[in-house]
């Protein structure tokens, strides 16, 4: 009997444990469902306004162990550069401002008869003495194409033509084709690449658009052109951008998945990755560089950063692969930290300051509020460093102290947020060392967004060559955008000047978007 009872007790204990595990899992799934609903139907921003302000309580931050904010005391005023400004409603742009980048043609009205032009007083024919613009309209010209034929001429000697040794010479030295054996030109190739990568139009839709213009160009042909333009020209320029990037002191990195159908030894469903590397706020011409890689391995991060200067500041998220990068000062992205805590807030508790997830968000918001203030006042990096030490360091210290006091169990969203924050402990204050460092990795996230937007339309790359070409073309296009260039003009400019592996970095720099001649030729934005 005792044995039977023991078995029953053990069985009941196991069932209770299984039931508790199921309840925990149910709670986690419910939390996931609430998060998905919040992402679909809730606010799209993680920033929460502070509604808890009244005459007796100027700020809620003392509740979190942070002293109320006082008026900033000047620190070495010679470093502070404050520009006065007045917030006002943005004036509506004029028609001339709206269309300042398009050419203007004029039609002179000639509706008066000869009789109408006679002076009613003396009968003399009146002469033009001035003009005025009656109205304006914008004309759309449908894109057009034409075939350009290079015609060579053969010259023969009229005297020797009937002899046994007729003499002739051929004038057939036409400019080299963009791609040997192909009929594409810099203008056609640049338009296709601009539509595909800047406007995210898939090749199959471009195929139809070209057919409407009278040209039958298959999507396969267009894809091959992209690959060959990359291997022949773009790659040499983007490699130069990467080499220049490695010389910078402030770097930012991010990555996002893509799908490549035909990778050696991998299934079509395998995840591949786009890696982004860009310059930070260093006062130099900004550089963006994209790289395709079959994996998210830290070896990719190591390869991308091979050759950087020791002591470089690297801003990235908490992905462990970046741990392989040595000799850098890692900066933590507080936007990621805030996002973790924001996603841990239970539905309907966004304004509940007693909720620990809300408190975590408020710590982050406090830091960002200081950064916004520095930007509004146009502080120089030297001043930002001093202000951060005074304003932001105490916030981070209080944040860490608060985190260490939290007691969590299970695998909840808040537990994950807290773990993510604590795991960044060694890097939380790195950005305080230099005023050029940023508080978040938002620049990288914004820079990688064009790839994610394009991915929704074209879904995948067919081959490794196609993926590599795509990333280099994205590099060219986003560099043009970053420097205020017309993206299609810049693509065409590069294809006309044809960078090669034989060019030195000095020669390649003449094709960079910050070059004066490039700015003058391609300098009108298309975005």
Regions found by a protein language model. Give the residues of each.
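Short, flexible loop/hinge motifs at secondary-structure junctions
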Residues: 1-182, 223, 253, 391, ...
